[in-house]
């Protein structure tokens, strides 16, 4: 019987030691990671067709932007990307903006410079 008592004392000492330093032990089960909530984006409520105020803003402000892309116009005027592309085509045909680069996925325009426009047309002719 005395050996059993010794084991109990040793076990009691071990369990007390385990309770003391659970953090410093490298073995054992790690805490399970909780799933984080994903970032919630606000729903964009962009216009599908122009109203009078937005169209006037397009005609007045957009030709003064240094960098004009469908993404920039869409974000600033709160219109759909397809509407922004069509609007920029119209401004280009009116001669209010100048094409810088055209690619399948990205079109870049800039404002018309007053001095730089005439010599460029003269060189082409």
Curated annotation (Swiss-Prot):
Family: Belongs to the eukaryotic ribosomal protein eS25 family.
Record's signal peptide: none
N6-acetyllysine sites (modified residues): 43, 52, 60, 66, 94
Name assigned to this protein: Small ribosomal subunit protein eS25
Subunit structure comment from the entry: Component of the small ribosomal subunit.
Compositionally biased intervals (Basic residues): 28-38
InterPro entries named among the record's database cross-references: Ribosomal_eS25, WH-like_DNA-bd_sf
Pfam families (alphabetical): Ribosomal_S25
Region of interest (Disordered), ranges: 1-38
Compartment(s) of residence: Cytoplasm
Keyword hit for Acetylation: yes
UniProt keywords, alphabetically: Acetylation, Cytoplasm, Ribonucleoprotein, Ribosomal protein
UniProt GO cellular component terms: cytoplasm; cytosol; cytosolic ribosome; cytosolic small ribosomal subunit; extracellular exosome; nucleolus; nucleoplasm; nucleus
Summary of the function given for this chain in its UniProt record: Component of the small ribosomal subunit. The ribosome is a large ribonucleoprotein complex responsible for the synthesis of proteins in the cell.
Annotated GO biological process: cytoplasmic translation; ribosomal small subunit biogenesis; rRNA processing; translation
UniProt-recorded Gene Ontology molecular function terms: RNA binding; structural constituent of ribosome
N6-succinyllysine, modified sites: 52, 94
Gene (name only): RPS25
Ranges of Basic and acidic residues composition bias in the record: 1-23
